[in-house]
């Protein structure tokens, strides 16, 4: 059986991973596969079990199911997974369906039995650690979940926050420009309300700090993704991050870096929403503009406390799938390459590698098992190749993850960027011409390579030679991304059979 070069490389690199740690510095070099536990894999291994996203019901995904599919995840070069919240949820089937997603918790000291047992969750952590991989768990400190109107909540159902005294007085957020409302009023509506915990109270604050430390310890968790961060006052978060004792990355759902970046002063990292829309808009059509993306790369790099600790993404369970905008596979390849080779920690959402095309929630929460988990799909292979060169560059260049990505070229349809110290840099050229894009040679300056140096394009496994003027003649065709790395540095790596 023929085995792809990237599979051999990734296996060799990851089984040799060093002892696990969970500091922000360690997380810089990770690559995250994000999944909804209920929608990724079932214990019975079924690839045909029905999962109608419109029903918004539990579909049967489990922690054991994830364990059984770690080869599939690791085969793409991912070094970590992020799973949705593990706490016990409201038990009812509401008018909006079940709490299969995990964001309507009612008992923070019990686990969601739909996903499995405490032993199953511990087994998942152990299985990841045996592979040199990390476990990131989603957590919610802002709110609980209630099946009913905000004005008639039975607070006794919440554990341990079993009285109204623990919560902000009921009011729904009316004005998102008013930060006081954003923090003190409630999310949800009168069908499913999300009672808002008053995290300014010491009793609430201390409960959360004790809880998060215990959660991390009990299940050997390596990192946390924190939901609805902007809905909690900033001075709550440093203590929470410290109590967790691991890298914390927060969801601050706002596109303005002037609003989002300061949250990095109160926790380790945030999801890179400022770059999300420029990235999406650059590649969701063949008429997208590279200008906003080029400018936002530089803005985030200069304005955020540390862009190398942000999470880069273009898909998640809250936003429409990239393929819901366009079915052009070349555009999807470019956006995936950007995610993996930009500054920060790459995040690919389960199903993205199979070109899933669900629109707004709940359509974007498809069951991954219905794809059959093919490892020969075009995006699976592209993601594996991009992760492979990133992982390899990190292993060879201690400064790679802290070297800030530098856009070196743009035109109406192209952006090029370099990352890594001189002599070991990756240069990525991205196009939005799409699959019908013409063939041409781009003369690229500013890449930092030397005249006559041979480079390997690691997606297509071809080579190019740097011109006498230092420019790189990059052959472009079919709107595909190009990723360059010095050929001599690949010796022994198995990447492109070491060229």
UniProtKB/Swiss-Prot annotation:
Residue runs in coiled coils: none
Gene Ontology BP, a term: carbohydrate catabolic process
Residues engaged in binding Ca(2+) 2: 227, 251
Domain of life: Eukaryota
Site (Transition state stabilizer): 318
GO cellular component labels: extracellular region
Annotated localization: Secreted
Binding positions for Ca(2+) 1 per the UniProt entry: 142, 183, 196, 231
UniProt signal peptide: 1-21
GO function terms (MF aspect): alpha-amylase activity; calcium ion binding
Catalytic activity reported: Endohydrolysis of (1->4)-alpha-D-glucosidic linkages in polysaccharides containing three or more (1->4)-alpha-linked D-glucose units
Keywords: Calcium, Carbohydrate metabolism, Disulfide bond, Glycoprotein, Glycosidase, Hydrolase, Metal-binding, Secreted, Signal
Glycosylation sites: 218
Cofactor note text: Binds 2 calcium ions per subunit. Calcium is inhibitory at high concentrations.
Cofactors required: Ca(2+)
Positions contributing to substrate binding: 56, 104, 143, 225, 230-231, 318, 365
Active site: 227 (nucleophile), 251 (proton donor)
UniProt-listed Enzyme Commission number(s): 3.2.1.1
Cysteines paired by S-S bonds: 51-59, 171-185, 261-304, 461-496
UniProt record similarity statement: Belongs to the glycosyl hydrolase 13 family.
PANTHER family in UniProt: ALPHA-AMYLASE 1, ALPHA-AMYLASE FAMILY MEMBER
Protein name, as recorded: Alpha-amylase
Organism: Aspergillus usamii
């Amino acid at each position: 059986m023929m085995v792809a070069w990237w599979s051999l490389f990734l296996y060799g690199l990851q089984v040799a991973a060093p002892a696990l740690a969970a500091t922000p510095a360690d997380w810089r070099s990770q690559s995250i596969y994000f999944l909804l536990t209920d929608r990724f894999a079932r214990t019975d291994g079924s690839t045909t079990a029905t999962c109608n996203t419109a029903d918004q019901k539990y579909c049967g995904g489990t922690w054991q199911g994830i364990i059984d599919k770690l080869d599939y995840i690791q085969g793409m070069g991912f070094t970590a997974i992020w799973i949705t919240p593990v706490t016990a949820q409201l038990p009812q089937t509401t008018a909006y369906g079940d709490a299969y997603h995990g964001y309507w918790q009612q008992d923070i000291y019990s686990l969601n039995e739909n996903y499995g047992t405490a032993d199953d969750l511990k087994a998942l952590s152990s299985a990841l650690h045996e592979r040199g991989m990390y476990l990131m768990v989603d957590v919610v400190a802002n709110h609980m979940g209630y099946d009913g109107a905000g004005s008639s909540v039975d607070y006794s159902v919440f554990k341990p926050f079993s009285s109204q005294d623990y919560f902000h007085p009921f009011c729904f957020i009316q004005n998102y420009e008013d930060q006081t409302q954003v923090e003190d009023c409630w999310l949800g509506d009168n069908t499913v309300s999300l009672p808002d915990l008053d995290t300014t109270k010491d009793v609430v604050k201390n409960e959360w700090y004790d809880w998060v430390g215990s959660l991390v310890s009990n299940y050997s968790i390596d990192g946390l993704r924190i939901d609805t961060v902007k809905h909690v006052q900033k001075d709550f978060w440093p203590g929470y991050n410290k109590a967790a004792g691991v890298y914390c990355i927060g969801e601050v759902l706002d596109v303005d870096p002037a609003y989002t970046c300061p949250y990095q002063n109160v926790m380790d990292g945030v999801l890179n929403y400022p770059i999300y829309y420029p990235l999406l808009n650059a590649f969701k059509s063949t008429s997208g503009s590279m200008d906003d993306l080029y400018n936002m790369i530089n803005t985030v790099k200069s304005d955020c406390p540390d862009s190398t600790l942000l999470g880069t993404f273009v898909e998640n369970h809250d936003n429409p799938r990239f393929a819901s905008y366009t079915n052009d596979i070349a555009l999807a390849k470019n956006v995936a390459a950007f995610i993996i080779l930009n500054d920060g920690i790459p995040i690919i959402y389960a199903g993205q590698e199979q070109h899933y095309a669900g629109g707004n929630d709940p359509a974007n929460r498809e069951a991954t098992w219905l794809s059959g988990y093919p490892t020969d799909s075009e995006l699976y292979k592209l993601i594996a190749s991009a992760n492979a060169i990133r992982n390899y560059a990190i292993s060879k260049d201690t400064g790679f993850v802290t070297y800030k990505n530098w856009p070196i070229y743009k035109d109406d349809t192209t952006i090029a960027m370099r990352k890594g110290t001189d002599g070991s840099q990756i240069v990525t050229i991205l196009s939005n011409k799409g699959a019908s894009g013409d063939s041409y040679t781009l003369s690229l300056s500013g890449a930092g390579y030397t005249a006559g140096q041979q480079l390997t394009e690691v997606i297509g496994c071809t080579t190019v030679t740097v011109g006498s003027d230092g420019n790189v003649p990059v052959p472009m065709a079919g709107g595909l991304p190009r990723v360059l790395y010095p050929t001599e540095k690949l010796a022994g790596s198995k990447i492109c059979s070491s060229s």
